[in-house]
Amino acid sequence: MPLITTEKQFESDIAAALLSPAGGYTRNGDCYDPKLGLFVDTLIRFVQRTQPNEWAFFEKQNPVNPVRKFCTAFNNACDADGLLSVLRYGFKHRGRRFRVCYFQPESALNQKDAQRYAQNEITCNRQWFYSDTTHNSVDMVLAVNGIPVFAFELKNQFTGQTVENAKQQWMHDRDPREVCFQFNKRILGYFCVDLTEVWMATRLAGKDTRFLPFNQGSNGAGRDGGAGNPPNPNGYLTAYLWEEVFQKDSMMDILQKFMSLQDGKTLIFPRYHQLDVVRKLVADVRQKGAGQHYLIQHSAGSGKSNSIAWTAYRLASLFNTENKPVFASVIVVTDRTVLDAQLQETISGFDHTLGAVEAIGEDKNSGDLRDAINNGARIIITTLQKFPVIYTEVNKTAGKNYAVIIDEAHSSQTGTSALKLKAALADTEDALREYAELEGKAEDEIDPEDALVKELTSHGRHKNLSFFAFTATPKAATLELFGTEYPDGSHHPFHIYSMRQAIEEGFILDVLQNYMTYSTCFKIAKTIPDNPDLPASRAAKLIRKYEELHPYNISQKAKIIVETFRETTSHKIGGRGKMMVVTSSRLAAVRYFHEVKRYIAEQGYDDVQILAAFSGAVPDGGVEYTEQSLNVRADGSHIAESQTKKEFHNNFNVLIVAEKYQTGFDEPLLHTMIVDKKLKGVKAVQTLSRLNRTCPGKTDTFVLDFVNKAEDIREAFQPFYQETFLEQEVNTDLIYKTQKELRSFAVYSDADVEAFSKEYFRSTKQDKNAVGRMSSVLKPVADRYNQKTQAERYQFRRLLRSLVKWYGYVSQVARMFDEELHKENVFCAYLLKLLPPDEVSPLDLEGKLQLEYYKLQKTFAGAIELEHAKGVYEPVTQKGALGHDPKEPLDEIILKINEKFKGEFTNADRVLLTALHDRLLADPKLAKLARSSDPQIFTESIFPKAFDTAAQDSYLEAQDTFSSLFEDTSKYKAIMSALAEWLYGEFRKK
């Protein structure tokens, strides 16, 4: 008999799984009433069986046709509150509450609720004829006590149809006006399913219905990969939908604890990775208890706010086997004010018994945070910076567990505020026992209130603190602190939803697909006859700043900015596209603002409306400018800083920024970014990611970069495109190397550290003379410091800062119990505050420089492609002290700047040579070969092939520039020889 591959067989296989004992569903044999949108007999039977007294009351109040009137009351409740709310809380009729379903209790000890849950009639029906005006049927419907809640259209590639056909069917063949398809009245989720993919929507809106992918990811949920689903050796690729997601208990769990109504108009069904991460986190906590650390690497576009809200709610409502909450409080640490409102709205829709979410926002102080913790608030939202003020005022934490959810976990988690959070919440019983053993004392001999003991025992991990760190761009320190340690010593995220998957699934746009870079070519000359010695790096920065702020430079770029907006941005997103200009400084932002305005007026353009965004006041030309003074509406009124975002969204289309709105700014209409600032690492990813938000009509983005090379941007994004992990844990003993280097300066001694510690850690240190005594101890140390040379003072301060920062990191990772080192760290932290940096004589180059030559040249246009590879961090190491800024003659500094930015423009060969040098210098493979080869092998055997490839690639990008290279053999060989020798030396230095 031939194998059956029809759609009916697909439908039959799904139904068989759902109707099995494992699936938990039964087939509904009752009739469906299309006008009421209910399996009426099923609903009434459930109410009569589970709430006999309430039903008797209802019949008494409604003796004529009580069934029809009950259905009417139910429909009225759905009209008023929505079906999701009615499912969770029921509805009231004449003072009596009627429940239409019961959910599984959190605690297994709650037998009564468990029995009620078992009385639900959870049904699955094939070929659901939903209308009395058409003969159309939906392939499958799932109902709770006669109320249709989820529906499926199934397609089969073997019969020539896919999920795309199912989408069309939902959009064009299903009337949203039908009772069963009205928003939040019956069906809460519309699914399109084929053999390989699942898509879903929560609102039918004809051709405007928005379907989202509901797939696991190409390597499975929570794993590194792209869009789609992994192979399933045991059946269909999409079997997770009916075997896991819509298994009876799972489906009821989603209705009770995941689905939410936001803004009263958007019904949220969790995406697969969100459902997966929350359930895996809860399962791990149930298995291991408190004290674990979890790193969740979820990209922009992952719905991180909802994931945090669901995680917070589930952790706050999690009970142990003794029917007690696992966590005394769940504390969400965030700097995003939008998360406050979203968490409160989402959680209040789940459970009215948890109490209000305590948001300790800008309008509240640290005392409010202390009170919320001491009063046992179930969910608290706060910033990290409020903990240092109250960490000693939190009541006894022994025996209490806390869950700390960190929104956008970065290196701030290695600082003082993070340590104070731990000090406030930690149950130090185990740490005290460990400390006593190391000291060779009985536990009762150790005073837990001793200041030094309290600080030492707050370090490292604690059995009562669970950390859940969410971030799209984990740094090495973040992985070390929160990542899961593998047997080989590497640290990995607990769960991953990668940037690659978010892009491939269409939740964010790839901001690197349309990227254009320019190089700024200029030559600067000095206008004075003398040639003074100046600090090289400071002078170089000033000269570079001179070029950046030069009126000619800004005028040329302003023209490109305006014309790019008019030619590209203004035509995007249905004519609503917007642009952001990222400048290098507040002064640059002010000057760009004026120059762009001038150019717009000069050209007579009326379609470019600009705003500026920066903090504080900026003096320029004797006038002080603020954001509010520059930003003016069409009616002449000034725009307050708090209104800039709103005005940009509604009435303006170009925003010029300086260190503002580069992170956390969510404007979906932002299409184009002009970059005139050096961007590196996480900062580059966060800044450019302002463009990646999606909205109807937005299909691409555009970046024009005046400063950064395409390769630099690729290197910034690559580590976060897929999974990021730390190859090896930190060597905590490296801190002793820094300590030894500090001591070599002989600025302070053990006696100084001990004298300071005696004052700092004494129990009465809060008396009025404590600060005076501490500063008295530090005074002779400062005197010895001041006797050092300027270069030595610079080195010492760098090392001092390094030790304090390094110790803060190490004490988060490990509990060292090194009293002497801890004392020295506290001593160094206060000494650092006392030692002022050396007075730096101002460099005045005003009137001493002039711009001789300037040219903007396009160097790259196209897509910056990222590899399908994981990002790897080497172990975190300490930063050594940097050398003092040497002085060089002004002529020499200008020569170096001109060389770096191709100042000798009369010689075309020099441009060619420099371009090839830059391309080859950026080749990591070539660098590795240079470091492992002798000069002859490198120049004769290795380099020629690399040079030829670079020359050909360069020719393809700029034929006019590089054609002469292939026309003159002697020139080709001369340049290749010169570069081979030069680059070999450069590579060997690294």
Model-derived regions, located:
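Conserved segment of the helicase C-terminal RecA-like domain
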Residues: 690-719
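Interdomain helical connector at the RecA1-RecA2 junction of SF1/SF2 helicase-like NTPases
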Residues: 226-238, 242, 477-576, 593
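Catalytic cores and motor modules of nucleic-acid processing enzymes
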Residues: 25, 39, 48-51, 56-69, ...
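Post-DEXD/H (motif II) to motif III coupling segment of the RecA-like Helicase ATP-binding lobe
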Residues: 414-511, 521
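ATP-dependent helicase/translocase motor core
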Residues: 2-329, 338-354, 385, 399-401, ...
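Conserved RecA-like ASCE ATPase "motif II neighborhood" in helicase/translocase motors
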Residues: 370, 376-408, 412-423, 430, ...
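A short beta-strand element within the Helicase C-terminal
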Residues: 654-657, 662-686, 701-705
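Conserved C-terminal RecA-like helicase domain
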Residues: 544-655
